[in-house]
């Protein structure tokens, strides 16, 4: 609610690009700065549950499915795809999965793959994790990004963390020689861990299972210890502060 109240007036003022179905926005901005501001406001509004933003994203996805023409403006496709996958049913996830396999555009392929990790359906997230590592349906260079992005999804955090530990030997055998890949994976999967249980699991993994991880695990342990400490000391105070009426930020 805090973020929505902060951005609501400016979001409704800026609106959406008007070349899509049922668009409720203003004329497509011409300056780069204005276009980026519009994109940021749409991202915040959709991420934090603005109902009009959700309706617009769903309308874009529905139009794409029914017409087989993608009229979603390129600069907000990642937001619309992710929002649609998170709100709509399994058929939409399958549609995005199909488009991921049928497109040859590298940048579009990346956006579609990331959108698949936005689902609230843990079955689909688990399916994607398993497909990424045990089949050739996901390019080998994208497997680490899939695991990381599932971990950044609140519904997928524990799934990705569990999957990482269970499949560590396979992951390390495949990517271990590229230390930067291991470091990216470890930091990406652990950066949002913040409970005492997760900290204990990380400590246990560091002591018994993280062979070949190098210096990335000790760094991750420091970060998670900091996360747990912050939550213990400041979480209640932080939520109390968020409940206070916000002072106007945007005109």
Short names for language-model regions:
Residues 1-251:
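Long, ordered, helix-rich scaffold segments
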């Amino acid at each position: 609610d805090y973020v929505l109240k902060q951005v609501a007036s400016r979001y409704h003022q800026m609106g959406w690009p008007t070349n899509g179905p049922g668009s409720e926005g203003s004329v497509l901005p011409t300056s780069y700065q204005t276009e980026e501001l519009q994109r940021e406001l749409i991202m915040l509004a959709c991420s934090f549950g603005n109902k009009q933003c959700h309706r617009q994203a769903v309308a874009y996805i529905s139009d794409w499915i029914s017409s087989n023409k993608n009229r979603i403006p390129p600069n907000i496709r990642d937001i619309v795809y992710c929002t649609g996958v998170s709100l709509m049913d399994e058929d939409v996830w399958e549609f995005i999965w199909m488009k991921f396999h049928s497109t040859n555009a590298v940048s579009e392929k990346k956006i579609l793959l990331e959108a698949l990790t936005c689902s609230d359906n843990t079955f689909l997230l688990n399916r994607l994790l398993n497909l990424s590592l045990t089949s050739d349906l996901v390019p080998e260079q994208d497997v680490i990004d899939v695991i990381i992005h599932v971990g950044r999804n609140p519904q997928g955090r524990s799934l990705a963390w569990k999957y990482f530990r269970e499949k560590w030997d396979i992951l390390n055998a495949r990517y271990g020689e590229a230390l930067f890949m291991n470091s990216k994976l470890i930091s990406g999967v652990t950066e949002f861990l913040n409970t005492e249980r997760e900290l204990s699991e990380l400590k246990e993994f560091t002591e018994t299972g993280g062979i070949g991880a190098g210096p990335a695990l000790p760094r991750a342990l420091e970060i998670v210890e900091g996360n747990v400490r912050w939550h213990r000391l400041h979480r209640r105070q932080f939520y109390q502060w968020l409940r206070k009426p916000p002072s106007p930020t945007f005109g």
